[in-house]
């Protein structure tokens, strides 16, 4: 996408950014109740932000009059006409899901050294529990050596406005976006990569439930709890897997009758419920996943039915590998059409609420299903079974 030392279509990208930004601010306020503080920072700059909704690139852009190139999943750019349109309008920097980030980092470096602005969400994926996730320290090294300014930016309220497990469901409340700090190139050169990383971690840290307890905000919408099974798959009362079912604002275990409601504030309400929020429930569930992995013998740890597996063919989409059931064992992951030794899996991540991307060396797989599944459990399990796997939620 590069030509003559810059980016092909550069003038078009700037025009589209400036022309659509005022409209984007209006639409984001109508849909989310989103407000933002306009930044007057001059480029080139590396912009880093926490990641909470699918709308984050548009939300972040509302604060910056200067155009920036976003790092985005290669999968989005392969998504039919919409992906081609996004590529033509703004030419994002592609990032392979569950693959190595080295090529992406080099492209970002070239852009920054040519005086262009780059925006990246270093977590790589949206939060599941409302807490900013860990990320690779390579972003700090890039910031220090690029010669550009570093801008840290935080979005708040997005976790409840658009929960990842809820798919495209949007609940209107209050969202806000603002620059946290601007670090000059001189400041960055005076710091070590570790110090820069610590600053980024501190600036981007957000705990949605902690903020919500202090200043409760209602996020109104329909069917508030539907598809929560994409996140929760263990009943805390009977301990059975895949027995929780959601409908409207209620989740119920069809085995033991345990039930709770998801409130407009994002908290949970129910008789004898052990957790009043999804952050604590998710932490408990991760511990249970580790226990299940450690206690498993030669039987499957998890089984999910009715899945479709494709291999990712770079530049031309995907190719069907098989349909059927997937099973995770301590030593392998069995997919329709392939059996992957756990030690050969080098990367695992999720796109959206439940599309599972798996890398085994240079081969990339994507697991999809028209049925609601909790696929995030595989990330926790595989990262425990294989400590060398690149893990992204």
Where are these regions (language model features)?
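Soluble catalytic domains of membrane acyltransferases
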Residues: 3, 7-17, 21, 26-198, ...
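Phosphoinositide-dependent membrane-docking surfaces
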Residues: 47, 325-356
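Broad, structure-driven detector of short, well-ordered beta-strand segments within folded domains
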Residues: 153-155, 243-245, 260, 324-330, ...
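Short amphipathic C-terminal alpha-helix that caps PH/PH-like domains
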Residues: 192-208, 375-388
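Short, flexible loop/turn segments with low-complexity composition
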Residues: 210-221, 391-393
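Cys/His-rich short segments
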Residues: 220-273
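Long, charge-rich boundary regions
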Residues: 261-338
């Amino acid at each position: 996408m590069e030509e003559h030392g810059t980016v092909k279509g550069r003038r078009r990208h700037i025009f589209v950014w400036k022309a659509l930004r005022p409209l984007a601010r209006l639409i984001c306020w109508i849909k989310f109740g989103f407000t933002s503080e306009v930044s007057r920072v001059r480029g080139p700059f590396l912009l880093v932000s926490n990641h909470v909704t699918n709308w984050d690139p548009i939300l972040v852009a509302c604060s910056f009059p200067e155009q920036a190139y976003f790092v985005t999943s290669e999968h989005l750019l392969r998504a039919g006409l919409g992906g081609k349109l996004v590529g033509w309008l703004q030419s994002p920097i592609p990032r392979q899901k569950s693959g190595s980030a080295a090529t992406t980092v080099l492209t970002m470096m070239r852009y920054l050294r040519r005086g262009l602005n780059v925006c990246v969400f270093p977590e790589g994926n949206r939060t599941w529990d409302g807490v900013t996730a860990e990320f690779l320290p390579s972003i700090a090294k890039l910031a220090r050596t690029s010669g550009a300014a570093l801008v840290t930016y935080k979005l708040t309220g997005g976790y409840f406005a658009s929960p990842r497990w809820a798919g495209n469901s949007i609940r209107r409340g209050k969202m806000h976006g603002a620059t946290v700090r601007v670090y000059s190139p001189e400041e960055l050169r005076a710091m070590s990569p570790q110090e820069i990383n610590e600053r980024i971690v501190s600036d981007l840290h957000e705990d949605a439930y902690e903020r919500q307890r202090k200043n409760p905000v209602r996020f109104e919408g329909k069917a508030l709890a539907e598809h929560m099974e994409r996140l929760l798959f263990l009943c805390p009362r009977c301990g059975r897997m895949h027995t929780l079912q959601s409908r409207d604002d209620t989740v119920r275990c069809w085995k033991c009758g345990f039930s709770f409601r998801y409130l407009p504030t994002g908290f949970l309400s129910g008789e004898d419920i052990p957790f009043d929020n999804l952050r604590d429930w998710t932490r408990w569930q991760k511990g249970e996943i580790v226990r299940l992995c450690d206690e498993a013998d030669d039987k499957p740890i998890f089984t999910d039915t009715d899945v479709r597996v494709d291999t990712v063919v770079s530049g031309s989409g995907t190719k069907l590998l098989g349909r059927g059931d997937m099973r995770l064992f301590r030593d392998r992951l069995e997919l329709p059409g392939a059996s992957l030794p756990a030690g050969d899996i080098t990367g695992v991540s999720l796109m959206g609420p439940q599309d599972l991307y798996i890398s085994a060396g240079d081969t990339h797989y994507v697991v999809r299903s028209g049925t609601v599944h909790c696929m995030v459990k595989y990330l926790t399990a595989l990262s425990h079974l294989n400590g060398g796997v690149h893990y992204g939620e």
